[in-house]
């Protein structure tokens, strides 16, 4: 099935379920990549108390979609429901006329997330997952001051004209669009932090900002124009460092030492044990292992010690990646990185060759 549509296995617990089970109210805002509408794995069935965003992956690749999805007990929802964007559907979903749509999903999702933070009373702990998609293609957004700034800055820009087979709509001033989307996301993050401070939650809240992959090239995106990803080789869908190494920024006044750069190697499956440790969930593996399953996927290691500036951090023996669509596999052990393409191995010493140019296999 399409990536992001296949449901999470309901026999295996996921992080929001653990947090909810341990007294947290949970919210998620953005793209849900754990199951299609009506499947066994939608936000309402997986430990999420409040949800607003995309469950349909097709709509998730449009910023002026036909509909979004919502699950809100406070609004009387019994399950995930569709919220039709009435203004948008008055105009075509693709091609000429799409630019007349006005309901910009990224702004709508972000405002709902801010309202959710604002609704917290400070008595019950909260766990929020904000899966914003900016600056993923398609590269379109409102004609506001953010976009106008970059249109004036990039006087020689390019248009990306959508081919007939693409899911993405045409992007005019594609460089300006991409830069403005990054700035828009930065603005969102600033507003989230400001809301936490306004509510008095900033001294007792951990915020992590990260990404799911390296830069993409579709829909008019031009990573070469923007310096690619600095000294790293590769892009999204590749197992070179540029495809799998991503920004990871932690903010938590009084908890996370400020201004520290750390080279600890981690993967997203380390988030579950880390959050469990910080939330005081004891022996989560024993608690949440399914006795009816031969295998449970608790592969992570808590990096709470690294986050809080303490000694004794446990490290992975290795990290592993694969991407079946490009027939690429990679394994990293310390500074050694093996990348396999179509079965042929390539070996790099990242301590001397972070761009992965010198194959010593």
Each language-model region and where it sits:
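Short Gly/Pro-enriched turn/cap motifs at secondary-structure boundaries
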Residues: 5-8, 236-241, 310, 319-322, ...
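Active-site-proximal cap/lid insertion segments
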Residues: 34, 38, 55-272, 276-297, ...
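Basic phosphate/pyrophosphate-binding loop/patch that engages nucleotide-derived ligands
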Residues: 20-23, 308-314
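Short active-site alpha-helical segment characteristic of glycosyltransferases
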Residues: 15, 31, 271, 303
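Short glycine-biased active-site loop of nucleotidyltransferases that positions the nucleotide triphosphate
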Residues: 40-44, 311-312, 329-330
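Residue-level marker for buried hydrophobic side chains located in beta-strands
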Residues: 28, 207-209, 346
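Active-site segment of extracytoplasmic enzymes that catalyze sulfate/phosphate-ester chemistry
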Residues: 1-28, 37-38, 43-50, 60, ...
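Short, surface-exposed beta-strand/loop micro-motifs that present aromatic residues
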Residues: 16, 116-118, 327-339, 346-347
